[in-house]
C-alpha cells in the first residue's frame, strides 16, 4: 500500500547541508499498522511527511496504492491526497468550528452535498465515540477528545491510508491507551493501512504489526514487532525495548553492591526472557540441575506482537562453578543474562 524506495531528503540552511533522510526504503503492506520509532531529530517527521509529499524527497520514489506521488502535478497530487488521511501531535482543529464543523470541513471543500456530509459526519462521530459532542467547540474538549475529532476529520474522505505523526505524544498515559485502541479498532473494522511515527516503544508494542528503527536519517532495523522484541539486532532497538520493561535495583541493594566478587557477596542477575523462554520453567530447572538457589527480587512481563517477554532481577546463591554453569544453561535456552554486580 505504501512503498518508499531509496528516499533521501536534504535541506539547505545557508551554507550548511543537512541530510534528514538517507536512502530510506520502507514497505507498508495493505491493512497493516506499521510503526517507525526513533529519538528526536532522527528523521521520523520528515519521513512521514514525504509519504504524502508534504515534503518532496530530494531523491527516491513514493508509491501509495501503486501510484508514484513524485511524478504527479499539483492538481493530481491534491486528488491523490484524498486517499491519505493524517493526524498530528497538535490537533490543528479550527477553534471557530464545532466538532461537527471540523469533521465536515474536508467534505465541504470537496463540494459534497449537505445530505451526504451529514450522513458521513454522523457515521464518524459514532466511530470515534463523540456523538454527544457534535455541537461542542474545541476549547471545551479534552486532549483525547480533540484527537478523536482529528481522527474523524482525517477519515472523512474515506482514505485508504492514515498517517500518524506522534499522535499520542501530547496525551496522558490513559488517554494514549484509549486513542491507540481506537486506531487499532479502526484498522480492524475498516482495513485501514496505518503508518505511525513515535519515540515511545509502548506505542509500537500496543498496536503495530511491524516496526522500523530510524537513527540519523537511516533505517537501521526493521521487522515484525514480535521479531524485533524477541531478537533485537541493534543497540538502539534494545534500548527502546528496555524502556518498556525497566526494573530498578532496590536502593539498599544499590548502596552495598560491588562491581567485583567478594567474600559473602552473591551475583545480582538481570534476566531477560523472550518468546518460548518466557513459558519454559527454566529457573526451577536450573535450581534442580545445578544445586543452586535463585532469589527473585522483582520481575515484570508483557506482550508485543503476540509474543511474551519479561525481565527479572534475582540473586544467585551457591557454588561459583555451579552458578556459572547455571548461567550458561539459561543463555543456551535464549535467556539474556547480565551480572549487574555482587550484593
From Swiss-Prot:
This protein's record includes keyword Cell membrane: yes
Membrane topology reported for the UniProt record: Peripheral membrane protein
SMART domains: AAA, NIL
Reaction equations catalysed: L-methionine(out) + ATP + H2O = L-methionine(in) + ADP + phosphate + H(+); D-methionine(out) + ATP + H2O = D-methionine(in) + ADP + phosphate + H(+)
Residue ranges annotated for the ABC transporter domain, each copy included: 2-241
Family annotation (InterPro entries): AAA+_ATPase, ABC_MetN_proteobac, ABC_transporter-like_ATP-bd, ABC_transporter-like_CS, ACT-like_dom_sf, MetN_ABC, MetN_ABC_transporter-like, NIL_domain
UniProt-listed Enzyme Commission number(s): 7.4.2.11
Major enzyme class: translocase
Location within or outside the cell: Cell inner membrane
Keywords annotated in UniProt: Amino-acid transport, ATP-binding, Cell inner membrane, Cell membrane, Membrane, Nucleotide-binding, Translocase, Transport
One GO MF term: ABC-type D-methionine transporter activity
Biological role stated in the UniProt entry: Part of the ABC transporter complex MetNIQ involved in methionine import. Responsible for energy coupling to the transport system.
Subunit structure and binding partners: The complex is composed of two ATP-binding proteins (MetN), two transmembrane proteins (MetI) and a solute-binding protein (MetQ).
Family label: Belongs to the ABC transporter superfamily. Methionine importer (TC 3.A.1.24) family.
Protein name: Methionine import ATP-binding protein MetN 2
Source species of the chain: Yersinia pseudotuberculosis serotype I (strain IP32953)
UniProt gene name: metN2
Amino acid at each position: 500500500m505504501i512503498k518508499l524506495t531509496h528516499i533521501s531528503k536534504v535541506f539547505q540552511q545557508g551554507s550548511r547541508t543537512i541530510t534528514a533522510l538517507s536512502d530510506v526504503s520502507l514497505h507498508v503492506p495493505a491493512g497493516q499498522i506499521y510503526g517507525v520509532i526513533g529519538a528526536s531529530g532522527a528523521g521520523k517527521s520528515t519521513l512521514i511527511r514525504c509519504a504524502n509529499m508534504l515534503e518532496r524527497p530530494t531523491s527516491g520514489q513514493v508509491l501509495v496504492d501503486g501510484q508514484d506521488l513524485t511524478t504527479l502535478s499539483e492538481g493530481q497530487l491534491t486528488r491523490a491526497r484524498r486517499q491519505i488521511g493524517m493526524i498530528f501531535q497538535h490537533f490543528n482543529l479550527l477553534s471557530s468550528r464545532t466538532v461537527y464543523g471540523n469533521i465536515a470541513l474536508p467534505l465541504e471543500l470537496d463540494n459534497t452535498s449537505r445530505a451526504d456530509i451529514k450522513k458521513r459526519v454522523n457515521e464518524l462521530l459514532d466511530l470515534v465515540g463523540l456523538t454527544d459532542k457534535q455541537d461542542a467547540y474545541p476549547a471545551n474538549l479534552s486532549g483525547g477528545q480533540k484527537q478523536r475529532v482529528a481522527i474523524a476529520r482525517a477519515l472523512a474522505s474515506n482514505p485508504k491510508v492514515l498517517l500518524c505523526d506522534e499522535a499520542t505524544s501530547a496525551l496522558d498515559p490513559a488517554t494514549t491507551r484509549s486513542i491507540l485502541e481506537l486506531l487499532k479498532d479502526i484498522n480492524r473494522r475498516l482495513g485501514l493501512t496505518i503508518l505511525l511515527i513515535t519515540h515511545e516503544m509502548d506505542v509500537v508494542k500496543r498496536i503495530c504489526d511491524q516496526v522500523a528503527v530510524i537513527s540519523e536519517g537511516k533505517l537501521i532495523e526493521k521487522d515484525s514487532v514480535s521479531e524485533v522484541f524477541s531478537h533485537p539486532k541493534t543497540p538502539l532497538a534494545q534500548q527502546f525495548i528496555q524502556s518498556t520493561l525497566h526494573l530498578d535495583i532496590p536502593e539498599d541493594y544499590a548502596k552495598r553492591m560491588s562491581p567485583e566478587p567478594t567474600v559473602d557477596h552473591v551475583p545480582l542477575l538481570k534476566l531477560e526472557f523472550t518468546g518460548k523462554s518466557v513459558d519454559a520453567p527454566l529457573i526451577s530447572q536450573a535450581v534442580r540441575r545445578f544445586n543452586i538457589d535463585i532469589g527473585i527480587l522483582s520481575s515484570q512481563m508483557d506482550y508485543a506482537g503476540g509474543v511474551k517477554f519479561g525481565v527479572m532481577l534475582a540473586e544467585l546463591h551457591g557454588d561459583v562453578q555451579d552458578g556459572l554453569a547455571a548461567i550458561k544453561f539459561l543463555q543456551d535456552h535464549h535467556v539474556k543474562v547480565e551480572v549487574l554486580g555482587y550484593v
